[in-house]
Amino acid sequence: MGHYVSTQVPDKHFIVNQGFCPRHDTVDPDYVETVQAAHPKALFLAHPECRKEVLALADYVGSTSGIIDYAGASDAKEFIIGTEGGVFYELETRNPDKVFYPAMEDAYCINMKKVTLEKVRDCLRDETNEVFVDDHVAGKAVRALERMLELAK
């Protein structure tokens, strides 16, 4: 995602971590082109964590909520979705008249599926899995979160 953000703000210098999302990294440009050939009217909506070769094929690049909003506002009836498969439920619920195709063979992230409402409830109720950080780090994190919320307004 750092690479994508740096292309959107070219006047800024970014120091980008060399990490990646294992799910978005598996979106293969050749597979996307195969799906595009099978569904030529479909728009390809990609998450910015996909590789740049994949993003180059996209009609729209945006966050999960951006993809959901774009599909809802678009007049198009078919979409290829380049992000985690959990988004399909929301897309199909909001847009029953539209068709969505995955941009990867296995679109589900096993790590995201480990978090359930029951597990969150249990952690909050039982006060387990608490994370401790030193005050210096916590202060910086709070400022970053407050700024993020401010920008979202």
Q: Model regions: which residues?
A:
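The feature marks the mature, well-folded catalytic cores of soluble enzymes
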Residues: M1-K153
